[in-house]
A protein has these predicted regions:
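Active-site entrance/lid segments in N-terminal catalytic domains of soluble metabolic enzymes
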Residues: 1-36
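Conserved active-site-proximal phosphate/metal-binding subdomains
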Residues: 22-38, 44-192
Length: 192
């Protein structure tokens, strides 16, 4: 049968990431596959959703913005850390080991990066982070937990029900689609 769709996830996303941004990745994938492409990474509002659709995606996958959902079962401390995050508050660990992970900067992430830069072995790094996601998600340990989040964390400001998050995403995307069609940059110019 094969795959029904493919998710093209850019490096802006939280968790395990690659090097290409969503803006660069999605059109390249859309150009070479004959199945639907779902864009992921760096999508928190209707502007970004509309951009993903313009790049050739049939839809989007959102992650970081759903971490703040009232129904999301992560610890309240993790949610609070997401809500406090600013635009530059994520980092990527694990590049040297070939398993890059984007997460919020905290003492655990800074220590991991220090050890990684100092040439720590893969085993040492794995031992250091063992259980860190559990510490974040279930225990609410924002100092020693792996607070995976994408670069859009700085755009997430309040806890809302999932239905409200999705409705805002869709309604903003639809409204902007109408606005962008009349954008001056898209007007035909005489003699151009």
């Amino acid at each position: 049968q094969g795959a029904a769709a493919v998710i093209a996830e850019g490096g802006e996303s939280g968790g395990h990431v690659g090097d290409l941004t969503t803006l660069a990745l999605v059109p390249q994938v859309a150009d070479v596959v004959s199945i639907p492409v779902i864009a992921a990474g760096g999508i928190a509002d209707g502007r970004q959703m509309l951009a993903a659709l313009a790049l050739g995606a049939c839809g989007v996958q959102i992650g970081t913005t759903l971490l703040r959902a009232a129904e999301c079962p992560i610890h309240e401390n993790y949610k609070a850390a997401i809500l406090k995050a600013k635009d530059g508050d994520t980092t990527v660990t694990g590049r040297a080991a070939g398993a890059p992970v984007r997460l919020l900067k905290n003492p655990m992430a800074r220590e991991y990066l220090r050890r990684e830069k100092a040439g720590a072995s893969l085993e040492e790094l794995e031992h250091f982070t063992l259980g860190s996601l559990r510490r974040a998600v279930f225990d609410g340990d924002t100092r020693n937990g792996s607070l995976m989040a994408g670069q859009v964390a700085g755009m997430v400001h309040e806890i809302l029900p999932v239905a409200d998050i999705l409705e805002c995403l869709y309604s903003e995307c639809r409204a902007l689609a109408g606005v962008i069609s009349g954008h001056p940059a898209l007007e035909t110019r005489e003699g151009a």
